[in-house]
Amino acid sequence: MTAPADKGKKAKTDADGGAAEENEQIDGALVLSIEKLQEIQDELEKVNEEASDKVLEVEQKYSEIRRPVYLRRSDVIQTIPDFWLTAFLSHPLLSELLTEEDQKMFKYLESVDVDDSKDVKSGYSITLTFSENPYFEDKELTKTYAFADDGTTTINATSIKWKEGMEIANGNAKKKGSKRPLVEESFFTWFTDTEHKSLADGVQDEVAEIIKEDLWPNPLKYFNNEAEELGEDDDEEGSDADEGEEDEEEEN
């Protein structure tokens, strides 16, 4: 006759075995579900890659269509005095980058050009074209960005040939109106920042992004902001002058 304790032990063993088998079935079903889910995700990734390729094809097409229009726009802009200086100074972010000396140099800025590579996903260049000026010899200052498949960005820029006595030491200029010799960074130091960068590390050239994605598509938007402010100031001055004349007439 089996002892009660032995019966209990056997029942517990059977229960443990059943639970283990059930867990194995659950684990097996979970693995199959995850594998199936991964297959679907892989399929979605393939569709997304195809979609990205199609988007790039469309972007490439319209980049080529926009190019001659941008060139016509540039021709007109060159007939407007201080257009790019005004546009930069009206931009809430770019305006912070121009020192007083930079603004003097920007008086000679004739055109800004953003040109995508033939394969738009591989990079672009930003070129600033200047008229003859007392600061540097270069007609064009260009900064080029080349994007590699591994996520790195190779940057090349014009090495500015400063005229004698005009070079900004280390890209910095002394800030006027201060007892202490405060130093502010010149916009032109942007052309000296050409280290290899990795987008995977979250490193981006914010100045280039702002010029390319914000200022370049519609610089007139920023130029008009400045023009409107000047117009409002003129109107206020004219109004004050009119009021002064009226007061004089009343006194006479």
UniProtKB/Swiss-Prot annotation:
Residues 1-15 have a biased composition (Basic and acidic residues). Residues 26-67 form a coiled coil. Keywords: Chaperone, Coiled coil, Cytoplasm, Nucleus. Its main location: nucleus. Residues 226-252 have a biased composition (Acidic residues). One of its GO terms (biological process) is double-strand break repair via homologous recombination. Residues 1-23, 222-252 are annotated as: Disordered. Pfam families: NAP. Acts as a histone H2A/H2B chaperone in nucleosome assembly. The acidic domain is probably involved in the interaction with histones. Belongs to the nucleosome assembly protein (NAP) family. This is NAP1-related protein 2. It comes from Oryza sativa subsp. japonica.
